[in-house]
Amino acid sequence: MAKVTRDDVARLAGTSTAVVSYVINNGPRPVAPATRERVLAAIKELGYRPDRVAQAMASRRTDLIGLIVPDARQPFFAEMAHAVEWAASERGKMVLVGNSDYVGEREVHYLRAFLGMRVSGLILVSHALNDNAAAEIDAWDARVVLLHERPEAIDDVAVVTDDLGGAQLAVRHLLEHGYAYVACMGGTAETPSVGDPVSDHVEGWRRAMKEAGLSTEGRLFEAPYNRYDAYRVGLELLSGPQRPPAIFCSTDDQAIGLLRAARELRIDVPGELAVAGFDDIKEADLADPPLTTVASDRSAMARSAVDLVLDDGLRVAGSRRERLKVFPSQLVVRQSCGCA
């Protein structure tokens, strides 16, 4: 059986091969709805399958989007990657995922690999690119969108949450319960970059405490973002002579580790210790007790990031407002804070 070609589709649809290409590639020129329907019907009838490799060579782009995350084992990043994958599929794209493990060299490794594969664009969920890597992005004329992390340069394109405001909501809520003060479990000095959301979470905690006339001195505790290290830090913190009455954790993963430490030490939550987190991962609702936390619309953020990375015009022009999309944070009240 002879291979079906684009010429065959054009003959059956009564149009040119160029128009068939416009339909298949969704551009660059518009096609009348009636003509589009004829082409799609011809493609279906003939069973035509476009040669994506040839298309990529001709256009110097593929149907791939590169996504680099710090650690896909962490629930927040896994859920964000899943949301990006769904958003990309809605646009006819596929996603390649790389894990940087918070190491700049690994991030650059995936960056170069994805650019070499002619991805349509890159979405970076946390970044630590050096000047050489930034120059390489420019040399490849790559589309790059930051997701979840605030940009360092004014011309960067980013999709973020109101991390600072969300943290303030959580800490204010804990203080409204009448606790003497709220401690904070932040990140570590080694991991944050300039736009790291956890830095905003800590700053939001500081501002809420200051508003209440409370000192933050000696009440910020470092812990890696994952539950396992947070559990170990929690055991030490909760076993100390000055156990905090309430703790705001910069991530839900930290909070889940802290809850495990409290349970092991037979500390009642929220009776003897109130806890709040940030991210509203799926496990937050299943925690014991269910975790009060801060949520954002990850699906909408992912769609926005995909739309931006595929937008040809935004790279050339666009206001600061168009380049920085800030999604609101919402307080999700459950039982770990002391609410019934």
Curated annotation (Swiss-Prot):
Query: What InterPro entries would the database entry show?
Result: HTH_LacI, LacI/GalR-like_sensor, Lambda_DNA-bd_dom_sf, Peripla_BP_I
Q: Which PROSITE patterns match?
A: HTH_LACI_2
Question: Please, one GO biological process term?
Answer: regulation of DNA-templated transcription
Q: Which Gene3D superfamilies match?
A: 3.40.50.2300, lambda repressor-like DNA-binding domains
HTH lacI-type domain: which residues?
Answer: 1-59
GO MF annotations, alphabetized: DNA-binding transcription factor activity; transcription cis-regulatory region binding
Q: Which residues bind DNA?
A: 6-25
Q: What is this protein called?
A: Uncharacterized HTH-type transcriptional regulator SCO4158
- Origin organism of this chain? Streptomyces coelicolor (strain ATCC BAA-471 / A3(2) / M145)
Per the record's keyword annotation, is Transcription included, yes or no? Answer: yes
- Superkingdom: Bacteria
Kindly state which keywords UniProt assigns to this record, in alphabetical order.
Answer: DNA-binding, Transcription, Transcription regulation
SMART domains associated with the record: HTH_LACI (SM00354)
Q: Name one Pfam family in it.
A: LacI
